[in-house]
């Protein structure tokens, strides 16, 4: 189950998070999704959505009540930033989640698509500094 984090900026989202967590009990694992601009959110799961970002953008633009053009711009910036945290190149996008292990779910990687590959970053350092 994917829900808002308990520390979300919006009181309705915090309330929903609490009720979803209570309802899930010990039956279902929870993933917390990121707030719009990642405020106070520390993810531990990164999912490559590059292949699906155009579909996501089309869906956002259909959500007329949320100022979709402005919203889409913020989402695009955030998804690019999260991909950059994995050193992804070019037109890469990532969505992030936080999983907090709770009994009996200590590892749910088997349920998720593979995470974004982390590309190494090399920097030439003058030998005099080594």
Listing of model-derived features with the role each one plays in the protein:
Residues 1-130:
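Metal-dependent de-N-acetylase/amidase catalytic core
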């Amino acid at each position: 189950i994917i829900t808002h984090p308990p520390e979300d900026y919006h009181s309705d989202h915090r309330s929903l998070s609490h009720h979803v967590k209570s309802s899930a009990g010990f039956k279902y694992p929870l993933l917390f999704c990121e707030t719009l601009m990642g405020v106070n959110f520390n993810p531990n799961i990164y999912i490559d959505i590059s292949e699906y970002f155009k579909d996501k953008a089309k869906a956002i633009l259909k959500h007329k009540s949320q100022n979709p053009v402005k919203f889409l711009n913020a989402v695009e910036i955030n998804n690019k930033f999260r991909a950059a945290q994995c050193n992804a190149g070019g037109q890469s996008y990532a969505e992030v989640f936080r999983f907090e292990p709770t009994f009996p779910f200590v590892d749910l990687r088997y349920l998720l698509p593979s995470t974004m590959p982390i590309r190494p970053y090399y920097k030439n350092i003058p030998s005099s500094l080594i």
